[in-house]
């Protein structure tokens, strides 16, 4: 009595390996800006992952999802020192849980060309391999901030037909500043130039989009995931969700690796 019966929740942007960040102390002074959080917490964390820790990162997130009625998760994975087969490890854990997931590997230039290409191959391999009714695949990109034009072109050429991308966009001002410095274009303009956008692509965050970027997302049918708890935790700003909805953007809810209690 007094409770709702609802369909299962869908978490449209998560990081299973975020399970290891809970309560983790960051050495030295507290980061003042989001780029420092990446450099002092998230990038050292993902570099520390091996096959065993990848598996154990997924298990508490999946248990938490079951507990809170979240039945489908769209994960964005990175483990630059354990790339090959990493999506299979996550896929096995998802199948054991009985939940559903869409998986991808984060391609980035920040660990060098060899690992960028290894991440590309892992995405393509998993896209072509996945046959499970509980699993699907997309092609992961970190962000415009850590991808050159050459790398974006390689990813666009490599992705099989009918699939889209999963990419962080304008989570912090630094992503927009970097894109303007690289290309004289804002993040969404740059991604559109490389044919990254479209109805099968998910852009995460969009905190610092301008009106033109919102218009492009709406026109291309690209998805936008909103992570309010993460945005508040990282102090990156408040996404203009009402403006996005009025513009006709397809907005969905993610947790960025926080709890799968999607409505809290």
Please describe what each predicted stretch is.
Residues 3-5, 24-76, 81-99, 121-131:
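Alpha-helical scaffold segments that flank or form the walls of functional sites
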Residues 20-54, 111-112, 173-200, 220-223:
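Active-site gating loops and adjacent loop-to-helix segments of metal-dependent hydrolytic enzymes
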Residues 70, 99, 162, 221-222:
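A structural motif
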């Amino acid at each position: 009595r007094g409770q709702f019966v609802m369909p299962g929740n869908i978490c449209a942007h998560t990081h299973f390996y975020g399970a290891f960040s809970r309560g983790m102390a960051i050495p030295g002074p507290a980061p003042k800006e989001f780029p420092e959080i990446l450099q002092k917490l998230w990038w050292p964390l993902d570099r520390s992952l091996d096959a065993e820790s990848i598996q154990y990162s997924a298990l508490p997130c999946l248990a938490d999802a079951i507990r809170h009625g979240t039945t489908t998760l769209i994960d964005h994975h990175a483990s630059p020192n354990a790339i090959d087969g990493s999506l299979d490890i996550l896929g096995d854990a998802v199948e054991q849980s009985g939940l559903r997931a869409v998986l991808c590997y984060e391609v980035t230039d920040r660990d060098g060309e060899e690992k960028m290409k290894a991440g590309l191959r892992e995405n393509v391999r998993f896209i072509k391999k996945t046959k499970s009714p509980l699993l699907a695949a997309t092609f992961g990109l970190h962000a415009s901030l850590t991808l050159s034009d050459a790398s974006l072109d390689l990813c666009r050429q490599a992705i099989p037909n009918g699939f889209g991308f999963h990419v962080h966009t304008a989570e912090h001002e630094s992503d927009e500043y970097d894109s303007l410095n690289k290309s004289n274009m804002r993040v969404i303009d740059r991604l559109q130039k490389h044919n990254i956008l479209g109805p099968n692509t998910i852009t995460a965050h969009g905190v610092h989009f301008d009106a033109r970027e919102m218009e492009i997302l709406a026109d291309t049918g690209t998805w936008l995931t909103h992570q309010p708890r993460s945005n508040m935790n990282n102090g990156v700003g408040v996404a203009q969700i009402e403006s996005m909805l009025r513009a006709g953007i397809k907005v969905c809810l993610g947790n960025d690796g926080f709890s799968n209690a999607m409505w809290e």
